[in-house]
């Protein structure tokens, strides 16, 4: 009888070790995957300029298009990422670009800005997109809670 109980105990211990090891590997690879996706996103979509960084929504890097919605998403992604200094610096670069491209007399970002264009369409510079402004505002709230600067 004791042999049987002992074999059940060993079986239970082996199963527990297996479950814990699988869970550990899953958690480690999940965090690694998040960081890998964030790095790929940065390399593919983030364009750095002397006025900060923007999320490029165009297939051209030289004449990239910055939309306020994409800028808001980019700011949110940076805040929600867990790479402390990297994501914080990325957020502030995106924020700096936002500050340089607001509709005159407001705190709202111009809905569309084409980098490298000799002349911007006046309609693009005088109008904003509410959804982009809401994403930016939400990202600013989260950033103030996370980094308190």
Model-assigned labels for residue ranges:
Residues 6-8, 15-69, 80, 85-115, ...:
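Low-complexity, Ser/Thr/Pro/Gly-enriched N-terminal "stalk/linker" regions
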Residues 1-5:
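Positively charged n-region of N-terminal signal peptides that target proteins for export
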Residues 99-149:
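Extended ligand-binding groove/face enriched in aromatic
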Residues 62-73, 127-135:
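Aromatic- and histidine-enriched alpha-helix N-cap/loop-to-helix transition segments
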Residues 70-86, 135-148:
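Well-ordered alpha-helical scaffold segments within catalytic/enzyme domains
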